[in-house]
């Protein structure tokens, strides 16, 4: 059974001002386990980055507790915290004249002392971290020559080289194409299992998070933070109500979202297999509701002819 690495009790986050305090979210109670990938979802401006910065100790909390490995986060020194939490940010780093191995080696900074000289053990950790994310072939490449996906893997390798039990990532798939997004999410899930680390990330890639994450945090201004597995949040209606808006419908059977088209007409559609599915999709995209049980004068057969019907 995975152990609880992070414990959050009645957490309040936001920004203190001169005359008042802006509370972004409060009353957050949760635990984040080792060996799990947890994804934070929410609309722009809801406070995902504020929550992530607070959990990372980049900004102070307004109230409540954040405990990492049983210890209140505020009792850690900066040096101690650098051996507990590693963070991968969204911003692209414009690095020139630095190789992949050298950048990953910076993850050893909490252990190398003032001069930053890597020991053989440090070099072994760097090499192992590069191997874990599957980029040994990039080890001697210059960072500025890498693609966005390659660069993100390097930053994850750097976080692994830091050897912390907790890794936070701020929208790690933000600049990636779809195949790279899938690969990145699968990699992070695999790493959480293989290394038994606590990996927590914010993302806008809803569909991928629902298919890959172990736990989901849904954050909105009305309800604060709702937490559960994708399956639990589907069964209790949290996902459907969280994203309820015109044009979007949550399908509880697949656990995914689909576009809810407005229909001007309908046809009875016969057939089976992929041809039937693609024809139904094409018709519905064009405002025509189609299905086997639809009662309509127009009948379309996708894989043959029927009396009074059309062959497609």
Model-found features: residue ranges?
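The feature captures the beta-strand-to-loop junction immediately N-terminal to the Walker
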Residues: 41-43
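Catalytic Walker B motif of ABC-type/P-loop ATPase nucleotide-binding domains
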Residues: 167-171
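Helix-to-loop junction immediately C-terminal to a conserved catalytic motif
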Residues: 56
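Conserved structural motif at the start of ABC-family nucleotide-binding domains
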Residues: 6, 23-27
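Conserved ABC ATPase signature
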Residues: 142-146, 150
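Conserved ABC ATPase "signature" region
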Residues: 105, 120-138
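Conserved ABC transporter NBD signature motif
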Residues: 64-72
């Amino acid at each position: 059974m995975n152990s609880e690495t992070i414990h959050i009790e009645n957490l309040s986050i936001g920004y203190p001002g001169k005359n008042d305090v802006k509370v972004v979210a409060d009353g957050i109670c949760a635990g984040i386990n080792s060996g799990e990938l947890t994804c934070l979802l929410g609309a722009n401006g809801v406070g995902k980055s504020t929550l992530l910065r607070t959990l990372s100790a980049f900004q102070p909390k307004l109230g409540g507790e954040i405990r990492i490995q049983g210890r209140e986060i505020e009792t850690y020194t900066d040096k101690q915290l650098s051996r507990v939490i590693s963070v991968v940010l969204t911003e692209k780093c414009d690095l020139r004249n630095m190789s992949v191995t050298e950048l990953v080696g910076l993850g050893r900074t909490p252990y190398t002392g003032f001069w930053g000289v890597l020991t053989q053990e440090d070099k072994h950790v760097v090499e192992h971290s590069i191997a874990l994310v599957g980029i040994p072939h990039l080890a001697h490449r210059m960072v500025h020559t890498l693609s966005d996906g390659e660069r993100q893997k390097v930053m994850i390798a750097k976080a692994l080289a830091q050897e912390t039990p907790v890794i936070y990532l701020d929208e790690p798939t933000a600049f990636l194409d779809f195949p790279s997004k899938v690969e990145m999410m699968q990699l992070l899930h695999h790493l959480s299992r293989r290394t038994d680390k606590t990996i927590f990330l914010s993302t806008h890639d809803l569909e991928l998070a629902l298919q890959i994450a172990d736990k989901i945090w849904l954050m909105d201004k009305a309800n604060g933070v709702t937490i559960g597995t994708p399956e639990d949040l589907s069964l209790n209606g949290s996902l459907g109500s969280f994203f309820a808006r015109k044009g979007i419908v949550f399908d509880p059977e697949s656990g995914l979202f689909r576009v809810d088209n407005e229909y001007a007409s309908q046809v009875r559609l016969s057939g089976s297999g992929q041809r039937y599915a693609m024809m139904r999709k094409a018709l519905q995209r064009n405002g025509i509701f189609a299905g086997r049980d639809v009662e309509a004068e127009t009948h379309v057969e996708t894989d043959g002819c029927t009396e009074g019907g059309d062959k497609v």
